[in-house]
Amino acid sequence: MDINQLIEIVKKKICVNLNIEQIEIQDKTYLHIKHSTHQKDKFHIKILIKSKYLQNEKKIETMRKIYKILDQEIKKHIHSIQLKIN
């Protein structure tokens, strides 16, 4: 899977499962390329979400929801996730 495919899957899953107004996903894999733990087919993504619904939740609860939604992608294709909720 390439990064563009992963981004589309992540967007779709989050949009279907959470009440959001807007989502942007950025590839930040370049930040990890020289790390000893870097794996070729694992990506670092930054997820920016605009959601009044999620703003009212504790960040840890939002993270748990997103990790549950993206469970398969995290196991196979995601090295790390940065999350920002507005």
What are the roles of these predicted feature ranges?
Residues 1-86:
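N-terminal, polar/charged subdomain of small-to-medium soluble alpha/beta proteins
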